[in-house]
From Swiss-Prot:
Gene: HAT1
Organism: Zea mays
Positions annotated as active site in the UniProt record: 276 (proton donor/acceptor)
Keywords: Acyltransferase, Cytoplasm, Nucleus, Transferase
Pfam family, one: Hat1_N
The reaction(s) this protein catalyses: L-lysyl-[protein] + acetyl-CoA = N(6)-acetyl-L-lysyl-[protein] + CoA + H(+)
Protein name: Histone acetyltransferase type B catalytic subunit
Length: 468
């Protein structure tokens, strides 16, 4: 890591006089946010090093690496440029500034912070430049030791790209350790996985280039997945991290990784697939894929049709209890067994499928759909606190009239005063209602976004079938 001070002030000499000491009060150092003075670049050759015209990556937030306030103190005109090799994933940091001074907040020690992010990957410039001339054997070894995942929809348009499944040990574990800085920078809330723990695997998206000296592999992205025990005798597959390198994002590699994982889960009869704290975009892609799979899954059609019919014909304003858009329990189990979609994800996709099946111009059914989303979110956010100590209506279906049959009962008060719900004032309830409606609008907007993507992808699928 290179640190350079642009200008060095002459040292001040002290006088030996006994005059009264003068005290000067300077402005408190406001500091500078790391996001404003630090940039990270991904480079493929030595000529790009020290150039700011190369591929810049956009970390989700650099500030959180620098203390609670995310600021760096004690530097004037600070610039931190970090270059990461796309071949070996080593890094080189160039730090420059005009001068340092303690403005009341001390002088931030940059070296341990950068070491905390980049670890042993961070090397001096000469060594960093030398890494470009060497073949990264651990990438080649990891790919060679793995097995290619072949399934319907895998990279038919570009046979040079493939997904390789490897156990997280040996060369693959070493490769992952090199990728950790990019994971920390680009995957919000991520932490390095424990590669010593049993059950970890990686799926690598690689592009193979055949040369005279042999095959050369370029890493485009990866997923880290964990196989863990599910009682009594099955395995669950949890996706811990998915990362596509910045230049290759938007090319469908993340989608390809998810499809490969689904293929593994079905072919090996995994219990189900889960994702650890997915980002909004990853959840968007995942839901789009799962909705497409569900649309082609015949067992859901009767239940889906029944829900859609209820939304079209039911008048929720006259019901004692709101209609719930919940699929039958046996259908949820069938979906888990056949498609390996877990219950929470299926419920999310179910609402999207219902939305897709409704006519957006039918105001009654769309209003009923929104009412169902509202009731679900109200229950999730407010829980039982929203309905304590009050008269309730419980729908009791009978052979006479399903719409009009109900029972009335009072909820019991909690004896412990500390556990009782504080009665809310009308203005508080109004604010709560407004906030809840805003959240419902956001939820429906997200549902509509996935539905639009699914519709577009369905058209593409139909076009492919016609061409074939």
């Amino acid at each position: 890591m290179a640190l350079k001070q642009k200008d060095t002030d002459a040292a001040a000499t002290a006088t030996g006089t006994k005059k009264r000491r003068r005290v000067f009060f300077s402005d408190t150092d406001a500091g500078v946010e790391a996001n404003e003075c630090m940039k990270v670049f991904l480079v493929w050759n030595p000529g790009e090093v020290s150039s700011v015209d190369c591929t810049a990556i956009q970390p989700f937030d650099l500030n959180h690496f620098f203390g609670e306030d995310g600021k760096i103190y004690g530097y004037k005109n600070l610039k931190i440029n970090v270059w990461i090799s796309a071949k070996s994933f080593h890094g080189y940091a160039d730090v420059s500034f005009d001068e340092t001074s303690d403005g009341g907040k001390g002088i931030t020690d940059l070296k341990p912070v950068l070491q905390n992010i980049f670890g042993e990957n961070l090397v001096e410039k000469e060594e960093f430049l030398h890494t470009f001339s060497k073949e990264c054997e651990y990438i080649r070894t990891a790919v060679t030791n793995g097995s290619a995942i072949k399934h319907d929809g895998s990279y038919e348009s570009d046979p040079a790209v493939e997904i390789v499944r490897v156990e997280l040990q040996g060369a693959a574990a070493f490769l992952y350790s090199r990728l950790v800085p990019l994971v920390l920078l680009l995957v919000e809330g991520s932490t390095p996985i424990d590669i010593g723990e049993h059950g970890w695997e990686m799926l690598l998206v690689v592009k193979k280039a055949t040369q005279e000296a042999g095959s050369k592999f370029e890493l485009l992205g990866f997923a880290a997945v964990h196989n863990f025990y599910h009682y009594p005798e099955s395995i669950r597959l949890r996706i811990s991290q998915i990362l596509v390198l910045p230049p290759y994002q938007g090319e469908g590699h993340g989608l390809g990784l998810l499809e490969a994982i689904n293929y593994i889960a079905q072919s090996e009869n995994i219990y189900d697939v889960t994702i650890e704290s997915p980002s909004d975009y990853l959840q968007y892609v995942r839901s789009s894929i799962d909705c497409l799979r569900l649309l082609m899954f015949d067992p859901i059609k009767p239940a889906l049709g029944a829900i859609v019919l209820s939304l079209k014909e039911t008048n929720l304003s006259k019901r004692a209890q709101s209609l719930r858009m919940v699929p039958p329990a046996d259908l949820m189990e069938t979906v888990r067994q056949k498609l390996k979609i877990n219950k929470k994800q299926f419920l999310r996709c179910w609402e999207i499928l219902v939305f897709l099946s409704l006519d957006s111009q039918d105001h009654k059914s769309m209003d009923n759909f929104r009412a169902c989303i509202y009731d679900r979110m109200k229950g999730e956010i407010l829980g039982s606190a929203s309905g304590t100590n009050r008269k309730r209506l419980l729908q009791m279906p009978t052979s006479f009239n399903k719409e009009a049959s109900f029972a009335v009962y009072w909820t019991q008060e909690i004896e412990d005063e500390d556990e009782q719900t504080v009665e809310q004032q009308p203005e508080d309830l109004k604010t709560q209602e407004q906030q809840l409606n805003e959240l419902v609008d956001i939820q429906i907007e997200e549902i509509a976004g996935v539905a639009k993507n699914v519709t577009s992808r369905c058209k593409d699928k139909m076009t492919e079938l016609v061409v074939q």
